[in-house]
Structure formats: C-alpha cells, structure tokens
Curated annotation (Swiss-Prot):
Binds 1 Mg(2+) ion per subunit. Binds 1 thiamine pyrophosphate per subunit. Mg(2+) binds at D152, N181. Transmembrane segments: none annotated. Homodimer. It catalyses: D-glyceraldehyde 3-phosphate + pyruvate + H(+) = 1-deoxy-D-xylulose 5-phosphate + CO2. CDD domains: TPP_DXS (cd02007), TPP_PYR_DXS_TK_like (cd07033). GO terms for cellular component: cytosol. Its cofactor is Mg(2+); thiamine diphosphate. It is an enzyme of class 2 (transferase). This is 1-deoxy-D-xylulose-5-phosphate synthase. It comes from Pseudoalteromonas translucida (strain TAC 125).
Length: 620
C-alpha cells in the first residue's frame, strides 16, 4: 500500500523507531491514530491478522518510543499482534505482501529484521526467550533491556508459568507486559488504578521500597512483616498477588490505549531492578467498530471493504475437513454420551463451534495447554469414556511426551483428529504440519490414517473411534473431493489399502489427499495408483504383490520425507530384499515458507505436473 503523506503526515516521518523517538510525546496520540488507520487500510487490501494488531497500536508505539530498539530486546508472543511493530520497523511499504509467497513473514521472524529478536508463531514462548536474552545481557555486562509481550490467553500455558517461576528465582532485570484483552483477569481499570500504577512504578516508591529492604535486612522478622504488609496493601487495590508470589513486581492494570500513560509508566519501569510485570488492558479490534464487536471474526481476515460493516461471505464450496470433523462429532454424540471432545483453544479452527453449543457437557476447551489436553484424554479413557482430541498437527508437537507416556504406553483408546496436517499455506514455517507422521510412526500401539478426501475422513474417524487403541487421523486445511458427504459411516479394515487404478511397471502409493494430484501421472504412465489409507500398520500383503509385479515403487505424502510414510515403505521393502527401485516424494528436509497450499506444493514438485515430471525423470 502506497503511503499517502497528506493522510498520514506523522507516520510519513517515521521509517524506523529512531524517527519515532524524535517526535514530541504530545504527538503520540495523533501518531497512534494514523498508525491504526494505516493498519486497517493495509490489511483490508491484502488480508491477514487484524484485530490483535488494532489492539496493540498504543503499546507498540510506547515500547519503541521508550526503549532503544533494536539494542533493547523486544520479544512478541505468538506474533499476531505484531503488524504495527512491522510497520514501525522499516516494513511499512511491504505490508501488502504479508503472508504472500516471497512476501513479509506473517509473524516476527529473525531473518527478516533486526527488530524481530525472536522468531515466533506458537504461543507462550516469549518469557522464556526474553529471560535467556536478559541473563545473557547481564553476563556480558551490557545495559540493554529486555521486554516480553504476552497475551492473557498465552500466559495461561504451562511454559509461561515455568518461565515466570524461574524468572522470580534468578531475579533478572526484565519486563513482562501482560496484554489483557478479554476481561479474563480483571476488570479493575480506571483513574484510580492508573494513578496507583504511576506511584508503584515511580522512583519515589521504588527507592523507599528498596531502601527499606536494605535497612531491614538485618532484622528478618521485621523485614518479613513489612513485606507481608506491602503485599496486603497492594492486594487490596490490584489483582497481582499471584505474580508477586512468583517474585515479580506487579504494576497495573492500566489502560493500554492511553499512549501517554503507557509511555510514563514504561519510562518509570525501564530502570527498575529485578523482574517486573506490567498488566495492561486493551480491546481487541480497537478503533474499528465491526472488529470490536466481533474480534474472533476479525482475527484473521480476507480482503474486505472497511467501509462496510461485515466481511465478505465465503463462496459456497466443498465441505472442509474441519467442517466434516465437527459434523461427525455431533453425529456420534447423539449416539454415545461417553464421547468427550477436547481442544486446546482451537474451537473455531477445528470446526467445533456447533458441537460446543449442542453438547456443552461433552466439550472441553482446555485453553493453550496441549500437554494437559492429551493427558486429560488419557484420564477419560482410563475410566471408560471415549475421548477425541482435536488438535493442529504443529501443536501436537508440544505434547509429544504425553502422547507416548500417557496414551500409547498404556495403549489407551484415544482418538486424535489432527487438523492442518501437511502444508497449511500462509502461516508459514511455524504452522506447517510437516512432521506428525514422522514423530508418530515410531510410537508402539499407534494406528495412523490419512484420508484421500472428506468422505473417507468421516469413515476413518468412525473407524478410529471404534478401535481399542490410540488412533490418529490426520487431514489438511481446506477440502478434498467433490462428492456429497455421506451420512453413513463405514468401518474400515485396519491396515487395508485401496487400489484405485491397476497399471503396470510403476506403482504410486499415495498417503492422503495428494492422491488427486497423482491421477495425471497414473494415467499418462499407465501406473498402478493406490490409496494407502494407513501409514501404520501398512498393507504389507499389498506391498508384497506390488514389489513382485512392478519395477518402480513411488511413495507420495504431504509430510516430511525423512521418517514419514515413504520411509515406512522403504523399511519394509528392505526387510523383504525387494528388487525394485523406490522414489519417495514429499516435503523436503527444510522448513517450508509461507504461500498458498497450491503454490508451495508446486514449488516442492507435489502438484500434478511436478509428480509426473519427477517420476518420468526417475524412470528414465
């Protein structure tokens, strides 16, 4: 988006944070207004994450105004809220490329800018990373400051608490900013708390506090009494007792949209010693009425007209895998009250909105707590309930020990509905579901399935639900197949593949939705085409037939080649001393950047033409 200097006179002066610091403080409210307007107009023309960034405009301005970035370290959690940060740090004129192939990264990314001190995308990592940076600065004798910005959702995750517990122990000089935008911690915002925050963060109070500690250090009983009195006084006026118990000096809550208040408070806190936590209250979608009214709907948006009060409706199309999963859950719940559906804060994305409303007693959103989600399911299974864990592929990585130790080791019947498997598209490296087959395949007792289309997904979910062992059904973002979704549910034979087309010489073994892309190669080469369905157990009887009747075996998967489904076939063929040539097609040994699913598949040679070309090159 080209900057109209007449519309954005202040923003036009700022190409990096040093320029922002040249502005007089009384200009910051007007500057924040311009930044918010530019963000809205930019994202509405390009698509992307909107509501979170609208809510952090004043915070972003205040942080870059007070802190000497990039020398001072600023760490954003997750990164949805970092669009204003990107605009202020030299990337304003590239915002129209965000989340597009070869464009700006959707999240803070170290390779993109020196201002992005830590690459993010998953939640609750900021405090740990910032603590590491803070300790490093102290060891190097450098005076740089470290700030972690984390939301009220992300701070509930275990990793954030682990980091705060450690921070309180080592007492490193760093600041945590708790961006509370959902009224989930406190509603105590107003003139009194703003005034109290100024007092508690100011030098007068801090000097008295630290001086008293030194004076009373030789009189332990009196020191302990004074400390308790301070905690009780603060506890009557502020909701930060929990953080104080962890060893953090708590300030707030304050209005996160009062940029001058933020600047004053941050200036006070910048020079405080030890761990600090500033609690700010913000509104997701701030400044744009439709986003304020529907922050979830405006979290991630397509291109839209900001002058209208609604987002464009999606064009009718084939049902997505997430929709099919959600409908399947509702169908099963009508038949079985033992069904327990669990999600770690992915209700909308996993297609569970309808289920959560129709079956609230069987629905458990455990927040950003993947480890807990999996072990909760294990506990359900121990008592004869039927747990289904709906989780994104890239987030299941965070619960790997629980998958092994708490589920598979005990051979508990837990069904994992793994969404966003394979290439997900515009969210890039942190969200690609490239590794689940590789890290699950080595776990004993697991059954792993990959549907070729949405109808088959429904049958696989039903099959997994009936099994008496841990089962994973992994499916991609979006849809596959054009047929109407069947109302019936078919029990599939475990470990049995489906031969789609009988050919000669070349056999293409497809695991998942790339089956459709393999049709062209199968037709042109008169190859046998197999929908393998099961990654574990493999259909070894069929494999025996194929290696005795074909010269070339090709495996195809939307997963890392290393350790994936193709590797499983390789391992089996090696035990049989098979005299066939083997070609493995899948995701290469590198982190896949952002772009549409089709763009990235084509780039990796997993589109129709790419598969045909790769097989031709191999057999020739």
């Amino acid at each position: 988006m080209t900057l109209d200097s007449s519309k954005y006179p202040l923003l036009n002066l700022v190409n990096e944070p040093a320029h922002l610091r040249d502005l007089a403080q009384d200009k910051l409210p007007a500057f924040s207004h311009e930044l918010r307007d530019y963000l809205l107009n930019s994202v509405s023309q390009s698509s992307g994450h909107l509501a979170s960034g609208l809510g952090t405009v004043e915070l972003t301005v205040a942080l870059h105004y007070v802190y000497n970035t990039p020398d001072d370290r600023l760490v954003w959690d997750v990164g949805h809220q970092a669009y204003p940060h990107k605009i202020l740090t030299g990337r304003r004129d590239l915002m129209h490329t965000i989340r597009k192939k070869d464009g700006l990264h959707p999240f803070p990314f170290r390779e993109e800018s020196q201002y992005d001190t830590f690459s993010v995308g998953h939640s609750s990592t900021s405090i740990s990373a910032a603590l590491g940076m803070s300790i490093a600065a102290q060891k190097e004798g450098k005076g740089r400051k470290t700030v972690a910005v984390i939301g009220d959702g992300a701070i509930t995750a275990g990793m954030a608490f682990e980091a705060m517990n450690h921070l309180g122990d080592v007492k490193s000089d760093m600041l945590i900013i708790l961006n509370d935008n959902e009224m989930s911690i406190s509603e105590n915002v107003g003139a009194l708390t703003n005034h109290f925050a100024r007092i508690l963060s100011g030098s007068f109070y801090t000097n008295i506090r630290e001086g008293s500690k030194k004076l009373l250090s030789g009189v332990p009983p009196v020191k302990q009494l004074a400390s308790k009195m301070e905690e009780h006084i603060k506890g009557m006026m502020i909701p930060g007792t929990f953080f104080e118990e962890l060893g953090l000096n708590y300030i707030g809550p304050i209005d996160g949209h009062d940029v001058n208040m933020l600047v004053d408070t941050l200036r006070n806190m910048r020079n405080l010693k030890g761990p600090q936590l500033l609690h700010i209250k913000t509104q997701k979608g701030k400044g744009y009425k439709p986003a304020e009214a529907d922050p979830i709907g405006y979290h991630g948006v397509p291109k839209f007209d900001p002058n209208t009060s609604s987002l464009p409706k999606s064009k009718p199309g084939a049902a997505t895998f997430s929709n099919v999963f959600g409908d399947w859950l509702c169908d099963i719940a009508k038949q079985d009250s033992k069904l327990m559906a669990i999600t770690p804060a992915m209700r909308e994305g996993s297609g569970m909105v309808r289920f959560s409303k129709e079956h609230p007693d069987q629905y458990f959103d455990v927040a950003i707590a993947e480890q807990h989600a999996v072990t909760l399911a294990a506990g359900f299974a121990c008592e004869g309930l039927k747990p289904v864990v709906a989780i994104y592929s890239s987030f299941l990585q965070r619960a790997y020990d629980q998958l092994i130790h708490d589920v598979a080791l005990q051979n508990l019947p837990v069904l994992f509905a793994i969404d966003r498997a394979g290439i997900v598209g515009a969210d890039g490296e942190t969200h690609q579901g490239a590794y689940d087959l590789s890290f699950m395949r080595c776990i004993p007792n697991m059954v792993i399935m990959a549907p070729s289309d949405t109808n088959e997904c429904r049958h696989m979910l039903y099959t997994g639900y009936q099994a008496n062992c841990p089962v994973a059904v992994r499916y991609p973002r979006g849809s596959a197949g054009t047929a109407e979704i069947a109302t019936n549910m078919q029990l599939l034979e475990i470990g049995k593949a489906d031969v789609v087309k009988q050919g000669a010489k070349v056999a293409i073994l497809s695991f998942g939705t790339l089956l459709e892309n393999a049709q062209l190669a199968a037709d042109e080469l008169n190859a046998t085409l197999v929908n393998m369905r099961f990654i574990k157990p493999l259909d070894t009887a069929l494999l025996d037939e194929l290696i005795n009747s074909h010269d070339v075996i090709v495996t195809l998967e939307d997963n890392a080649i290393s350790g994936g489904a193709g590797s499983a076939v390789n391992e089996y063929l090696a035990t049989q001393k098979a005299q066939v040539s083997i070609l493995n097609l899948g995701i290469p040994d590198e982190f896949i950047k952002h772009g549409t699913q089709d763009e990235m598949h084509d780039e990796m040679g997993l589109g129709e033409q790419g598969i045909l070309t790769a097989i031709k090159a191999f057999i020739n």
